[in-house]
Regions:
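N-terminal secretory signal peptides that target proteins for export/translocation
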Residues: 1-10
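Beta-rich carbohydrate-recognition modules and glycan-binding surfaces
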Residues: 28-217
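Proline-rich low-complexity regions
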Residues: 10-12, 108
């Protein structure tokens, strides 16, 4: 009888495991109402300029980076945005780093960005550091569009947000951006892109089952 009872318990655990793995939509439905939207950066108070740029070439080839009061997303009540202009003569890849990186101990599902572009052909990546302590480069968009556009990036399966050793909550750190220049630009051309309000969908981290040391993702 003990053997039969033990076998039944194992079978129940196996079924429960496969229900969890094969039916993520059930859990997603339960979790959908607990996400909240927070502002990561709205560019209303912080200053941005050459001090935020990290590039391999000399400062004389740095792009123009500044806060703009002219370019503002029509979707939100915005007064300022981050304006970046890259001329053909200064065509190079570079990083735009926050003076104070944004951090979150909550689980971050996605980031959303209100962006303007003039179809310049460059690409923009997010620079984040996850619980592995490695810096990750995540593709946000290719600048193959003109005008304003809301760009969302789901990072829930792209980075680790649980501590692999102690299983405690660990921070996700948003360091800034990496701009990758197009292979070539026509002489006299310029690429302009603007980043306005950056938002994140977050929820608390918690244990999956009592006594378990696995954080829900």
């Amino acid at each position: 009888m003990k053997t039969a009872g033990k076998s039944s318990l194992i079978a129940i655990r196996i079924v429960a495991f496969f229900l969890f793995v094969l039916s993520p939509s059930i859990f997603a439905k339960d979790l959908s109402g607990i996400y909240k939207e927070v502002i990561v950066q709205d560019f209303e108070t912080d200053s941005f300029g050459e001090e935020n740029i990290k590039a391999k070439l000399g400062p004389e080839l740095n792009p123009e980076v500044r806060i703009s009061t002219v370019f503002r997303t029509p979707e939100r009540d915005s007064e300022k945005s981050l304006y970046v202009e890259v001329s053909a003569e200064r065509n190079q890849s570079f990083q735009i780093l926050f003076k104070k990186p944004w951090t979150s101990q909550e689980f971050v599902k996605e980031f959303s960005f209100h962006m303007y572009a003039n179809e310049g052909g460059g690409s923009l990546f997010l620079l984040v550091r996850d619980s592995t302590l490695d810096m990750k480069k995540l593709l946000l968009t290719h600048f193959n569009f003109s005008g304003w556009k809301k760009v969302s990036l789901d990072i829930s399966r792209k980075v680790r947000q649980d501590d692999l050793v102690t299983h405690k909550n660990s921070e996700l750190v948003f360091l800034g951006f990496l701009y990758v220049a197009p292979f070539e630009m026509k002489r006299g051309a310029r690429e302009v892109f603007v980043i306005d309000d950056i938002l994140a969908k977050v929820r608390p981290k918690y244990l999956l089952f009592p006594g378990e040391k696995t954080l829900v993702k």
